[in-house]
């Protein structure tokens, strides 16, 4: 069940000092109402590759974004903790190059895109995210990656982790799988009828179906 906009929010903690700046792009479902940012003061907008991003000055090391957030871009902000559990409308999160060790997306049933490369995540459970189409979680410390049993997943990038197993049964729409530089011993692709690209080198694979 979706929560109302009064309780919808995303929060995170950063290792950056008060007075330093962070850069974010926040999209919300209700275009007429801007999300409220607590813990950081808006300074200016900048443009990157045709997209508008906001530069904010930290007034606290804990930042709360209130509103019906549909997409959050929050890369390279020294984030140590992030809470997405109160963002039921979230369809996309881009959290690359932070220091995040845990990402709970169990309540984000609308999520179609998750990018969290270059963090410290060890367990990533995506069983609730059946609408997920794009996953990129390269260069973490992931030893357990659980994909939804039946999903819309097209692209999965999970290289440079600590995976020993990778269950991709039920991923019958998967087109690209990059899982190199792990410790995977067995890979069963029999249900991946749409698979176009596979990169699984630098593992310990003894059985490939």
Give residue spans per PLM region.
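Consensus "Asn ladder" position of solenoid repeat domains
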Residues: 77, 95-98, 116-119, 140, ...
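N-terminal capping/linker segments that flank leucine-rich repeat
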Residues: 1-92, 109, 151
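Conserved, compact domain cores that house catalytic/ligand-binding motifs in diverse enzymes
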Residues: 85-120, 127, 138
């Amino acid at each position: 069940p979706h929560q109302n906009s009064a309780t919808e929010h995303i929060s995170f903690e950063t290792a950056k000092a008060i007075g330093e700046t962070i850069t974010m792009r926040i999209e919300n479902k209700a275009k007429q109402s801007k999300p409220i940012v607590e813990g950081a003061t808006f300074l200016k907008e900048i443009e990157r590759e045709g997209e508008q991003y906001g530069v904010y000055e930290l007034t606290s090391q804990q930042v709360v974004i209130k509103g019906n957030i549909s997409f959050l871009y929050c890369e390279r902000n020294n984030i140590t903790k992030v809470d997405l559990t109160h963002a039921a409308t979230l369809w996309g999160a881009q959290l690359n190059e932070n220091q995040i060790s845990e990402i709970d997306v169990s309540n984000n049933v609308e999520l179609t895109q998750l990018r969290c490369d270059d963090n410290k995540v060890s367990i990533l459970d995506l069983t609730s995210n059946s609408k997920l189409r794009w996953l990129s979680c390269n260069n973490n410390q992931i030893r357990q990656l659980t994909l939804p049993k039946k999903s819309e997943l097209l692209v999965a990038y999970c290289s440079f982790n600590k995976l020993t197993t990778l269950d991709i049964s039920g991923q019958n729409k998967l087109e690209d799988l990059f899982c190199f530089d792990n410790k995977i011993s067995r890979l069963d692709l029999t249900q991946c009828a749409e698979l176009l690209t596979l990169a699984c080198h630098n593992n310990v694979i003894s059985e490939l179906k």
